[in-house]
Amino acid sequence: VTPSSTRPIRLLVVDDSAYNRRNIADVFADHPEVEVVGKAADGEEALKLVTLLKPDVVTLDLEMPRMDGFTFLRILAATVPTPVIVVSSYSQRENVFKALELGALDFVAKPDRLTPDATEVREELLKKVLLVRSLRPSFVPRSLVRRNGSGAFAADGTPTGFDPAPVRVLAPYRPPKCVVAIASSTGGPSALLQLFARFPATTMAAFVVAQHMPDKFTRTFAERLDKRGAVRTVEATDGDLLAPATGFICPGRKCMEMVQKGAELRLRVGPSAPTDRYVPSANRLFKSVAPLGAACIGVILTGMGDDGLEGARAIRDAGGVIIAESHETAIVNGMPGAAVRAGLASEVLPLPSIGEYLSKF
């Protein structure tokens, strides 16, 4: 159950470094909306404290003695579902995405040593802890590892039934029959991993994604999406050519737009503009694909705020389709909810149905 607005958010800090535990706790020391109710040095101690203290959110280091963060996440998801924010160094990018697949809500990237003057990290940590007030009341971690072993993924998170995506030969050039532009933020990485696992190698669509994520993580995330399914997926670079069964993730701290030159559809990747409220900007991406009219689909997944709203209006006005993730599965209903309230959603679907819908193109 998410915390009410009348009491502080109860936070449990889990890290094997006493120095890091102190620095993380200090971020919230004088904040009226957050109470640090406990600290743990490893996963075993953390599980005991979760049961005893019933925190609203946990910050988690992944590399710890006795019980590491991955084991903690598996047991937590099966016993006491609780929002978890991973605090990890830039050098541990692969581990971060493994944690997200195991059900972690989000992550904060930090330098290898967290110092009290790391202002940007402290602000990001505070923002993401406060975000738990916006979670759906029935929050359950969106783990990709099926507990019964009969789903689409093996116990280690490896997809079953898919071979690694082949490198596509793009000559002679064939444009995609449809461009699917996807907007996502908090909860988005695990949602995208599930979606991309559904897309068949025979799809005639190209997929372009604006996921709010730090710049050092988007390439690793694109590589995981590429391994997850049959669509060849990369971090976008300026000039990339859209083709059937290709996927492109906008690099962090940049914005991505589609440009059409004759029959060619290419990507333009560059710095953000002062008018961009969110970076990467789903609004800019959506507006750029809108001229395709009925040949484009805008998808708005889980996330805080309203990025994608203006772009969704442009797509609808041009004759395209907008799909919003329903509140049943959206971890945070801000972005899709804004599109629904504005009357812009052609379809409002839970995540599995979005995958089914898009896999037909």
Regions inferred by a protein language model and the residue ranges of each:
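Glycine-rich phosphate/oxyanion-binding loops and their immediately adjacent helices
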Residues: A41
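Conserved acid/base catalytic micro-environments in cytosolic active-site loops
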Residues: V1-L12, S17-A29, E33, E44-E45, ...
